[in-house]
Amino acid sequence: IHQFQHNGRSFRANVKNAQLSGEAGRYVSTVAGLESHQVRPLYVRAQDPKTQKPYAPVALTKAATATGFPPVSSPECLSAPQTYSLQGDSALPTAVYTGTVFAPSVTNLICDYLPSQLQNALGLTDVYAAGLNGKGQTIVLVEAFGYPTLEKDANAFFKLAGLPLLNKSNFSIVYPEGKPASPNAGILTGWNLEMALDLQWSHTIAPGAKIVVVVAAGQDSEDFQNAIAYIADNQLGNQASNSYEEDTDIVAGPLEQTSWDEAIEVATAKGISVNFSTGDSGDEGLGTPVGAAGVPSVSPHATAVGGTSILNDVNNPGSTITTAWGDQFVVLMDYLIVLSNPPSAALTVWDPPLYAGFFGGGGGGESIFFPKPSWQASLPGKGRQTPDVSALADDITGVPIVITFDKQQYLEFGIGGTSLASPIFTGFWAIANEKAGWSLGQAAPAIAALPYGGVQDVLSTTDQTRNNVTGAITDENGVTNYSASEIFTGALYGNKGFTSAMYSIPGTAAVYGFGLDSSFTVKKGWDNATGWGTPYGLAFIDAVVANAK
């Protein structure tokens, strides 16, 4: 057993497979637990561009919520094209940029979807009108530690949203291994935010379904595998959402991969779709085709849920654009520290534009451990491919939650990650199971078998790129023009199907790029950015049920 470091974490792991000698050995399929990897939740929080910190929470007071959610957010993330002239402290360089504007810089509203707004964006209004809302189904959420105000926070959220409240008839919490020693363990480890997100948004999607929260006693992989086994043994529901990850496929060893897969396989064999988030870091710098397939989402018996962004279409008001979740950032102008005595800051137009990096995107990739299952025979490569499907995950186009800190309830805005995508998709699957009247089983092969259009394919469109930001910089050498793609030099991997929007406030100008998920790119049919696509309304529900008959 050796010590390793990965993604800034230290852990121990065995470098050789463990063997059990003696007669008992033939009764043991897997030895796990020799390593100290821990499972981590996959939520992310958007930063306020003005402060570079998470958005300030809003206290849930009677005054703030007298008419429902306080008016501090809007799903209108983009606004009409404008032209900005940039001038720093020196005469040159100067710049002129034209294109779509990131609306918060104009409106001062947080770009977020409230429950009714996201329901509408996902085509669920027609689903509910058809009498479908998950009734008769149970959604299982797999979490760690728990926290004391989970139900209270959720009901505060649902009251604001006008959704059915939780009670003993539609909600329960179980602790298969007993409650943690400290009731605040979930708060201290950050699992409270994860649990709030999963509960509040799975119920938003399928408000008629019951919800059972299965709480693991710790963060070790064995704790979660035991939780999945408990779900299978007790047939708690036809769908389970798991918004967490242990490691990437290339780091986790075969023993750990096998132990996860066996637990998931048993649940799948009992008709349960075990859905997992795929991660929030794109290909983690590993490129394609391998990428960064996550454990446990890479199990061929799991359904791997990746991420999308949902943006308003400035060319067609009332419509939305769905892209792969992949946020890139380019700085056009800001303050540059001058190494003088004393140091000073000079407002500087960047020449050329300064690529500031990748700020998050849906995970995925090809397994080097699991071969392709039969239902992925038409896909590239030799290994299990992820994701299978995607849903909203971008924290920049995120959602709010209600959470309690220091005995005060707050609304937190800008929450996302594939931690959001998994409960959204699981809510859809509960509605599909309701419509079917029987358990549809694992979602991944069912989605792979759908005729084209059954799940909404995420593709690059003209509307998506029409008003992307372009610019011209003037310096001592003359004028240099920059196309939308040239502004994102180094970030595209050949991908031209993205949306960009400019953010400009005094002292700062930048461009957001949406749909740039590291080396992953969208294309017709399955792709490593969004899988087969994203569920949308009755078209998805009806297609799944019709194809299963």
In which residue ranges do the predicted regions lie?
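Substrate-binding/charge-relay-adjacent region of secreted/lumenal peptidase catalytic domains
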Residues: I1-G307, P352-G416, S422, W438-Q442, ...
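Internal, charge-rich low-complexity segments
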Residues: Y43-A64, N312-I337, Y452-L492
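N-linked glycosylation sites
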Residues: N167-N170, N341, A346, N468, ...
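Polar, glycine-rich mid-to-C-terminal structural blocks
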Residues: P300, A304-G362
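Short regulatory "switch" loops immediately downstream of catalytic or recognition motifs
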Residues: I310-D313, I403-T404, E434
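Short glycine/serine- and small hydrophobic-enriched flexible loop segments
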Residues: T426-E434
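An often Trp-containing, charged/polar helix-loop segment at the C-terminal end
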Residues: N433-K524
